[in-house]
Amino acid sequence: MEANSNSAVPLCTPYKLGRFKLTHRIVFPALTRNRSQNNTPQSHLTEYYSQRATNGGLIISEAAAASDISKECPNLPGIWNEEQVEAWKPVVNGVHEKGGVFFCQIWHSGRLSVPTVSALFFSIGIGWSTRPDDKVYAKPTPLPLESDKIPCIVNDFRIAARNAIKAGFDGIEINASSGGYLIDEFMNDQVHGWTDEYDESIKDRCRLALEIVEAVANEIGADKIGIKLSPFDGKKDSNSEALATYMANELSKLGVLYLHVMEPRETVNRSLLPIRKAFKGTLIASGGYGKSDGEKAIDENYADLISFGRMFLANPDLPKRFEVNAPLNKYNRSTFYTNDPIIGYTDYPFLEVAS
């Protein structure tokens, strides 16, 4: 953790994230955009991420599925096979050419999965689910994951992390946030309803998350790992603070590089203090932040970095706009999850600076 030394624009001060020297504290987080046909990154992703890359700026990719059975819908990217690895390479190169630091978020979408092969984890029954692209998908009805299948899940994350490094990413972020996603389903006692060695206590419910982190750390190194949590969002655990604090302590022991925590938007700057005290690495705060409260969080050492999702989506040069206090583009919500490679994706205007 580093204290801020520039009271003028705290978000634009440098920060050392492990071996990475960041020039500002503004993070572009993982945002699902639904533009990777057949779960493979397309060429327009290169322009999209390159537009938002800055020298010494941290970017986290949209969630990439760890395996074929973990994907949420057909137009989200994956990182489980060689074709996907090769497709990610020009995207990563585009960010690196701008001097950016690029982490790949990896996930298993849990009960939201639309697997091509579903025999491992689902019953024969079919359920229906409407996803962000407004299409309705037939899904196998989810059943509790049998504990003897868990090593397969852990190994999927390990291989996906290895593939991400092979594609050129600087590190990976494990998605353990809420929304029906697998890791959070295990951690949250309001969702996880079966009894085995992964249930009962907080320690048991965090076991899967920590087994995944440890396996990935053994594969690529803990100094290349971040993890995203949202303990106060969605269907909350009965003791969210205790759960998050336990995870923060355990992740510190494993030497994880950063912890990325989503806050409930109505209580920004109030819920991360116990986590801040428990976690010894870099803390990234997220959750409806604007420029002023983001600066306050950095200035008061509440968090080390702040991620801005929709604001960064609509303003590809957001760090520059913050630096010069320029007006911001408004985002167009209707284009968030379309398949269009340009509209609402790469056509947001940059700040025009007079020569």
UniProtKB/Swiss-Prot annotation:
Family matches, as Pfam families: Oxidored_FMN
Residues reported to bind substrate: N175, A176, S177, S178, R265
The keyword Cytoplasm is assigned to this record: yes
Tissue specificity statement from the Swiss-Prot or TrEMBL entry: Weakly expressed in flowers and roots.
CC per GO annotation: cytoplasm
Protein's UniProt keywords contain Cytoplasm: yes
Catalytic residues (UniProt): Y181 (proton donor)
Induction of synthesis: Seems to not be influenced by wounding.
Domain of life: Eukaryota
Co-factor(s): FMN
UniProt subcellular location: Cytoplasm
UniProt keyword annotations, A-Z: Cytoplasm, Flavoprotein, FMN, NADP, Oxidoreductase
Family to which the UniProt record says this protein belongs: Belongs to the NADH:flavin oxidoreductase/NADH oxidase family.
Its job: May be involved in the biosynthesis or metabolism of oxylipin signaling molecules.
Protein name: 12-oxophytodienoate reductase-like protein
Organism this protein belongs to: Solanum lycopersicum
Gene expressing this chain: OPR2
